[in-house]
Amino acid sequence: MPKRTVPPGVGPHNGRELELMLQGDKPMALFGTEPGVDAEDIGDAGFAPFVGQGRILKFTHFDPETSVEDRRYCLPTEEWRCKLSLLISRMCRSGEAFNIFTSNDLARLEGTLLGYSKEDIEAFIVHAASRKAPNSSTV
């Protein structure tokens, strides 16, 4: 199977979350971790000093059923993004979100909360749909 290339606009913040947040270009970042995974591997190792200074806020949520810890970081005054992200995550885990939102709606909500442009969000949705239908050239 040929390796898929990621189109422009898909994942442009990956690995640059802290840099973009400190520049004020990204309001929120989200990382998930499991027991035994180092912060270096998660991607949020550099956030601690800025959390300590109050330049970035940190919200954590541990799900005892899955042993997954979600780490949400935001700029001051953007706390609502972390709170809404956690609410949506809880609704997805319970299944309630899928009675209200389509998967594309959820991708748009998450992308908006994370600070992606509308164009990047739509590029991600098209890319994700193409991965679900490998023999299809249109979405």
Question: How would you label these PLM feature ranges?
Answer:
Residues 104-111:
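An amphipathic, hydrophobic-aromatic interaction surface with interspersed Lys/Arg
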